Amino acid sequence: MGFDLDEDILQDFLVEAGEILELLQEQLVELENNPDDANLLNAIFRGFHTVKGGAGFLSLTELVDACHGAENVFDILRTGKRRVTAELMDVILQALDAVNAMFADVQNREPLTPADPAIIEALHRLSMPESEDEQAHHAAAEPEPEAEISMEEFDAV
């Protein structure tokens, strides 16, 4: 990548994307505790979308690819076609690490090191609606709630 771009545009990107990436880190930690928070899912989606847009404007293709993959995962999450799982969080955190590493490359005016292709592939897979097999696996992993009984039934026991 040539850094002969307008330095003002690059500086604007570095400031805005830097703030968004810091916020994304905090939001992902919060998501682990609140995986069904629609506002949070939308905010994370917008964060990756905004960084992707700025990176695209600057022709930072490798950064665009990683952000686009994460953005697609959050698009499917916010439409309810997939649920947040431990595996999904691991992949998203790895993707954010790759995005942060590329962001550091941009800050240092160095060529970008693309994300591991396995991360991009995992993002692509996780951006598809949850399969019936995955749904069955999640259902089996969740314990059945204990039945509630009335006081009359309890007294009868």
Per-segment meaning from a language model:
Residues 1-157:
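Non-catalytic helical tethers at domain boundaries
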